[in-house]
């Protein structure tokens, strides 16, 4: 590979871990952005994320995207 191309590009994953706050009780918990199962709040049991075949549909508020 010629020197003018520089570094080899490595694809980064589009999925992330995210911290979500429950709108009912205020509990914060970490979930996966592409969750394949229903994610419920550990305190009150409300559904925070529903799978859609791609990215999960979030019902809570995203606080932080973890790297």
Swiss-Prot record:
Zn(2+) binds at residues 22, 25, 41, 44. SUPFAM superfamilies: Zn-binding ribosomal proteins. Binds 1 zinc ion per subunit. GO terms for molecular function: structural constituent of ribosome; zinc ion binding. Its cofactor is Zn(2+). One of its GO terms (biological process) is translation. InterPro entries: Ribosomal_eS27, Ribosomal_eS27_Zn-bd_dom_sf, Ribosomal_zn-bd. The keyword Metal-binding applies. This is Small ribosomal subunit protein eS27. It comes from Pyrobaculum neutrophilum (strain DSM 2338 / JCM 9278 / NBRC 100436 / V24Sta) (Thermoproteus neutrophilus). The lineage of its organism: Archaea, Thermoproteota, Thermoprotei, Thermoproteales, Thermoproteaceae.
């Amino acid at each position: 590979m010629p020197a003018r191309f520089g570094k080899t590009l490595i694809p980064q994953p589009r999925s992330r871990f995210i911290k979500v706050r429950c709108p009912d009780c205020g509990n914060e918990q970490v979930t996966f952005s592409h969750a394949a199962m229903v994610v419920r709040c550990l305190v009150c049991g409300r559904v925070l994320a529903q799978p859609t075949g791609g990215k999960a549909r979030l019902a809570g508020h995203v606080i932080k995207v973890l790297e």
